[in-house]
C-alpha cells in the first residue's frame, strides 16, 4: 500500500486545480482518483456557441499562481493560439475550449488516475490516516493510505418526483441534452421546464433547429417555469464581488441557520440567465414573428409542474400545472420534456461511515465545514478532510464558482505545507460586507494556524 500526504477523490475542475497547484510542490505526495476514463466537463451541455459564464482567468491556477505552467494562457501558448485569442477579444471562452484545456492539464499530471472508482474510505486510528479503496473498470482493486483527503465528487443531475416516471417518450435532464438533441428535433412538441442558464441554452438550441416550415406544420416549443419570470443573472461589477474570498469569509462568520436563509434569497446571483442568451432568444422570436407569424416558442412563468403522466399509447405526455398567482390549474400535452431542474450534491455512500465517528455533523446531518474548507473532526484526529464545492450554505453563493476554485485550493495547499506559500489574505473587493466599525484589513493567518496542519 502506497502512502500519500493527500488523496483526492473525484477529478472535476476543483480537484484538478488542486492537483495542478500540488504539482509545484514535490515534497507533498498526492494521488487523485476518478471513476470516468478521462476528464470530461458537462459534456451534455457543451453546445455550439456556449461559453463559460466567468472570465478565462477562472482557470485551474491563475487566481492563485498566474505564472503556473498549467494556466490557460500557457495552454494557449502550447497550442499556438495566443494571437488568435488576442484577436478573439472575449474574456468568456467557449465551453468546448475549457473542456479541452482541462483535459490537456489532466494529461500533464501523473497524480491523476482515471478509471478508478473510489468504493470505500475508512479511517485507520493507529496512524490517523485514511485508507482509500478504489476499483478499476476490470474489477481490480487498489488501496492507498493518506493522511489527508480532498472530496471533490461534485453534484449530480436532479429530477423532481414528478419527473421520475417510466416512459417511452423522451424525458431527460438537461445534462443529457447535447447527446439527445437530434432525437428531440424529431418530436413535434417539446417542452423545457426551468428558467436557469441551462434551460435557456436548451431553448435557444431547439429554437435554432425549428424552421418556419416546421412551425407551419404544427411543431412548437413550450418553456415553462415556476419562477416569477425569465430573469437575468446578476452580473454588475459590485454584484460580482459576492464571488470573492472577502464575501466567502464574511458569509462563514454568519450563524449557520441564518446562512441558509440568506442563500435562499440570493438565487439571481448565480441561477439566472445571461443577458446575451436572453437577447438571442428574444431576437429570434422577434424576427420569426414578422407579419404575425407564430415564432414557434411560447413562454409561461409562474407555472409549477405538479403532475406528469403518459398520454395513453401516443408517445406523449400530459403535464399538470398550477399557476402560482392565480391558483388555477391547466393541462398541456407535449411529445418530449427537457427538465432543466438543476443539480444536487451526491455525497458518496462511504462518507456515511465517517460521519459521527470521525467527522462532526450539524443538526441537519451535514458536515461542519470550516472557513479553511476542512470538515471538523469529532475524534480529535489531525488528518484533514477537505471539502471542495461544499453546499452554498457553508461558504456562500461562490462555493460552486470556478473563479474561487484556485483560492480555495491555495488555502488547502498552504495548510498542507504548514505555511503561507500562496497569498490568500489580501482584500479582493471594494465593498465591505460587515459593519463600518469593522472595516479593517483581513487578519493574517498566523504560523500556528499552518503548523497544526503540517
Curated annotation (Swiss-Prot):
It comes from the Bacteria. Its EC number is 1.-.-.-. Keywords: FAD, Flavoprotein, NADP, Oxidoreductase, Plasmid. FAD binds at residues 7-13. Its cofactor is FAD. SUPFAM superfamilies: FAD/NAD(P)-binding domain. GO terms for biological process: rhizobactin 1021 biosynthetic process. GO terms for molecular function: oxidoreductase activity. InterPro entries: FAD/NAD-bd_sf (IPR036188), Histamin_N_OH (IPR031043), Lys/Orn_oxygenase (IPR025700). Pathway: Siderophore biosynthesis; rhizobactin biosynthesis. The keyword Oxidoreductase applies. Gene3D superfamilies: FAD/NAD(P)-binding domain (3.50.50.60). The keyword tRNA processing does not apply. PANTHER family: L-ORNITHINE N(5)-MONOOXYGENASE (PTHR42802:SF1), MONOOXYGENASE (PTHR42802). Belongs to the lysine N(6)-hydroxylase/L-ornithine N(5)-oxygenase family. This is Rhizobactin siderophore biosynthesis protein RhbE.
